[in-house]
Amino acid sequence: MKKYLISFLTLVLPFITFAQETQETGIDQQIDKAFKPFSDFFSDKIFFLVWKDPDIPFVLVLLVFSAAFFTLYFKFPNIRHFWTAISVVRGKYEDIEKHGATILYGEDGIAQGVDLNKVDDIEEHIDNIESLHSDLEIDGDIKETIRDESSHGEVSHFQALATAVSGTVGNGNIAGVALAIALGGPGATFWMVVCGLLGMSTKFVECTLGVHYRDVGEDGTVYGGPMYYLTKGLKEKGFKTLGKVAAVLFAIFCIGGSFGGGNAAQSNQATIVVKELLGWESTAAGFWIGVVIAFLVGIIIIGGIKRIASVTEKIVPFMAVLYILCCLYIILSNFSLLDDAIALIVKEAFNPKAIGVGGVIGVLLVGFKRAAFSNEAGAGSASIAHSAVKTKYSASEGLVALLEPFIDTVVICTMTALVIIIFNFGGFFEYGGDGSGSVFIDGVAYEGAGITSIAFHEFIPYSKIFLTIAVFLFAVSTMISWSYYGLQSWKFLFGRGKKADLTYKVLFLIFVVIGAAASMKSIWDFSDAMIFA
């Protein structure tokens, strides 16, 4: 621990010196000025257009059509296997792992209709089983069930889901939704939901592949993700060189994504709400908030995936439920406006009124872009976390993964959107704003999480305090998960040694500070580019 603390202080001290030297011009402005050309370069290169007026980037078309293809090819797994996925996460099959199929279920267990949930003493029940019904099993497994044999892996299905959800449920749900509505109007919500439903199939595919082609180290540590399934999968198909090149490119951009959308964008939004709550107008406020966040994240990410799973398993359900309850309170308190809000979402999805959105295609692109950023379906990042699950049945974890876009986009993003739309029935701002994502409320410019914050404050007294805490928790949990994604890609490129680990973590913490200090536009342009790449 001491050496990590020394490394962190070595990282921070030069920034402190730089901060003292730039008090007059403002360190936040200096960092933003230095970072903007870097952000613009990547944004221009990644989002090259296949069509102009409206602008349609190739990468967005690729993601959407891939999701539609997987949905049709696998016959709507997002609908047919939804309840099976919930059963796996709930641990329905844990008794099978603990006791074994041949012992747990026999003629007295299933054939005679005994409900094991109502058995007083399951151990006594097992002891009393004298005969088995062989027709119920195939190679020791019960028919029509999924068995978690724990042959390899580090975490449970639920922990893998929590780690991955914490990477998707973040400020894309709070700030991203507000940005989508500010730019595209209420209709953007409809297309976000559509993208989320299609994205469930994409998550199913990429996480199944992640488990199927994962590597297991000599010490039992699991390494997985697109860099592994691209290499192995394409090699099996006779495209060895293409697989290696694709894997290296993914690893590079995944590292970029961990610095951008999974890091800088999160600290950026956390800083915005903290500054607004505290009324901190200092030209170095973002920098110092970033230093604090970097310190907290640095302590957590030293633990590795097992500690990340432990932390996110506790944080994610709590913050998601609390945030949803607040959204529900606002929505139900204004229940008479709910049907109007839903009608407006559907109407403006096909007949948008937002200033400068560019018609149906424009609002569709806004919704799809923000949904893809929020749930990361197609980005491949979630398969890194899911590859660490304890199972030898890859498809079972694919089923678990398809729940993520539903939780993230269909549920949480939609609730955020309804709160903002109901709030704006009071005519507080014009949809479309100035075209940059900012809107003016009572003459004051608001953007991202700031829009959501003022909407909450209208209905819940002192909600700015709650939302600041929620944004902060979402940000930290997302950064924790993305640090793991980026580190796995870093190890793929540079090896699995301790020095490689430390180098990545130092760079990761630097981007926490950059994200907090730089402007929202620069950070989100860079983040979008890295996630979509």
Predicted regions and their residues:
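N-terminal alpha-helical transmembrane segments of multi-pass membrane transport
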Residues: 2-164, 183-186, 533
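Extracellular/periplasmic helix-exit of transmembrane alpha-helices
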Residues: 21-22, 206-219, 327-344, 352-354, ...
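Transmembrane-helix boundary/entry motifs in multi-pass membrane transporters
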Residues: 89-99, 141-161, 196, 207, ...
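Helix-loop-helix module between adjacent transmembrane segments
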Residues: 70-71, 165-166, 195-220, 231-268, ...
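Extracellular loop-to-transmembrane helix junctions
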Residues: 53-81, 91, 182-221, 413-415, ...
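Membrane-interface loop-to-helix entry segments
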Residues: 3, 70, 74-90, 246, ...
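Selective recognition of specific alpha-helical transmembrane segments in multi-pass small-molecule
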Residues: 195-206, 289-305, 316-336, 369-370, ...
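Alpha-helical membrane segments and immediately flanking helix-loop junctions
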Residues: 108-180, 218-233, 255, 359-406
